[in-house]
Amino acid sequence: IAKLCDSDLVIDLTVEGLMHARETAAILKSGARIMTISNEHPGILSRLRPDPAMKEIVRSAVAACRAATRMKVTSPAGTDLTVAMTDIPTVGVWGWTDRPGTLAHWPGGLVVSFPRQASCNGSIVFAPGDINLTFKRYFESAVRCVIRDDFITEISGDGADAQLMKRYLDGFNDPLAFATSHVGWGL
């Protein structure tokens, strides 16, 4: 960790290794920048090169989230989720790190907010063709997740995708596996 803290730039090629590690805060506090290269196929990375225009797009989205009191997410598939947004941390990633003590990942272009406890309620419906990033595959059948006070309380669906998601989360044997950590979207 001391060597990482002494560096100007740390390139992270692990699968979400430093992004969620306890040591990250110390590395960033030292002034080092962490650039995470997402676990994607090289063909995807070659198509998603950093775009200088993305920085301002992300900053505008962050400003909109910080000014919002409520986020309402709906979809034709049936998603209907409400998130309280007042005075919560929101960050954006545009695909590169250009300031000391910051972490970014490539590909970038997203905004993420960290809601207060018991502030996410409703349902999220994953439709066939949506991407399940955890399993790096497309949903083949609809999956509905009911969220009450930040926790998934029900997972339903007719196909294997619902069972796969439920068994995966159950496998942690930890109620926090069903909790909302953050909300956001890609830009």
Which residues are covered by each model-predicted region?
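Active-site bordering "gate/hinge" segments
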Residues: 1-144, 148, 163, 174, ...
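Dual-mode signal for accessory low-complexity, basic/Gly-rich regions
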Residues: 138, 154-187
